[in-house]
Curated annotation (Swiss-Prot):
It is found in: Cytoplasm. It comes from Leptothrix cholodnii (strain ATCC 51168 / LMG 8142 / SP-6) (Leptothrix discophora (strain SP-6)). Belongs to the prokaryotic/mitochondrial release factor family. This is Peptide chain release factor 1. InterPro entries: PCRF, Pep_chain_release_fac_I, Pep_chain_release_fac_I_sf, Prokaryotic/Mito_RF, RF-1. GO terms for molecular function: translation release factor activity, codon specific. The modification N5-methylglutamine is found at residue 235. NCBIfam families: prfA, PRK00591.1.
Length: 360
């Protein structure tokens, strides 16, 4: 481990003491947003400090065992301890490097996942429904909660567009790399000749704004329209103007919700989606600036980036950003995204590490 990284890890103990002092301050405890943020940081930093202390202890154990190699009666025991200590150090070294990487401030947030059908007509809408189901199944595997915020259903039961609200531990951290263009290659249900078609959808993953969020929605800049809900929901929902569409006039961003019978709840949900879209707009602008300075391997999350292909005839999934190919398409579409997400996170961590080491 480099002296620079050791210095960074040693500083974490000082930061932990600062957080403990802040959490003991009654003024800080009265500020819910600050308290929540500090508690999250405390959990992360305390785990990092604990690993660093174990690393230092195992270094001492290794040095002690190496000194015993010259004593014949202790040599065999020393060699066993050296092997165990080195294995622990290698594992802790990897864990510490990962934990030391700069974290996205939005990683701990819930997320909205917006899926829009693109090229391919009805087949694209059916693929959008497949993607929505994939994310819902993955959320179920992780123990996350989900809500359907809005949907526009196609003639064959696909989605022209759909917005999912996914709630749980570090949802955005796991799903943020899903933003971009998703392409499918398969024989559509509507294809009589058995020919393979290519269709596409776009996915946008937006971090949810906190209740006491920095995004302020000026009522004077909002146009709120109500209309009669369409689609599933029964007779009652179609007899009232319960659906709500909110337009942010300065940017033209729109959010709508029609899936609750209560106009008030639909409005609250639409405003939550709009706040997330405004935050994402700022995030995308910053990402564009960063991209001008350096080219990220996994991309910026730009919706125009084609990130992944799902090839049904071959049972193949290919993530083009990291040249990852898996022949387990069925499992992935059933929500088994862990290997894909893990590979993307590892690629991002490797980029960050390379950047961090240049600062040493």
């Amino acid at each position: 481990m480099t002296p620079f990284l050791r210095q960074q890890l040693s500083r974490q103990a000082l930061r932990l003491a600062e957080i403990d002092a802040a959490l003991a301050d009654p003024k800080v405890c009265s500020q819910i947003g600050t308290l929540r943020s500090l508690n999250r940081e405390h959990a992360r930093v305390s785990a990092l400090v604990d690993r660093w202390q174990r690393y230092e202890q195992r270094e001492q154990d290794l040095a002690g065992a190496q000194e015993l190699l010259d004593e014949p009666e202790m040599a065999e025991l020393a060699r066993a301890e050296i092997g165990a200590a080195q294995a622990d150090l290698d594992r802790l070294d990897s864990e510490l490097l990962t934990a030391l990487m700069p974290r996205d401030a939005d990683d701990d947030r819930n997320a909205f996942v917006e899926i829009r059908a693109g090229t391919g007509g009805e087949e694209s809408a059916l693929f959008a429904a497949d993607l929505a189901r994939m994310y819902l199944r993955h959320a179920e595997r992780r123990g996350w909660k989900t809500e359907l915020m809005s949907e526009s259903v196609s003639d064959l039961g696909g989605y022209k567009d759909v917005v999912l609200h996914i709630i749980g531990d570090a949802v955005f951290e796991a799903l943020k790399y899903e933003s971009g263009g998703h392409r499918v290659q398969r024989v559509p249900a509507t294809e009589a000749q058995g020919r393979i078609h290519t269709s596409a959808c776009t996915v946008a993953v937006l971090a949810e704004a906190d209740e006491a969020e920095e995004v302020s929605l000026n009522p004077a800049e909002l146009r709120i329209d109500t209309y009669r809900a369409s689609g599933a929901g029964g007779q009652h929902i179609n007899k009232t103007d319960s659906a709500v569409r909110v337009t942010h006039l300065p940017t033209g961003l729109v959010a709508e919700c029609q899936d609750d019978r209560s106009q008030h709840r639909n409005k609250a949900r639409a405003l939550a989606v709009l706040a997330a879209r405004l935050r994402d707009r700022v995030r995308q602008e910053q990402a564009a600036k960063d991209a001008a300075a350096r080219k990220s391997l996994i991309g910026s999350g730009d919706r125009s980036d084609r990130i992944r292909t799902y090839n049904f005839p071959q049972g193949r999934l290919t993530d083009h950003r990291i040249n990852l190919t898996l022949y387990k398409l069925g499992a992935v579409l059933e929500g088994d995204l862990d290997e894909v997400i893990g590979a993307l996170q590892a690629a991002h961590a490797a980029e960050q590490l390379a950047e961090l080491e240049t600062q040493a």
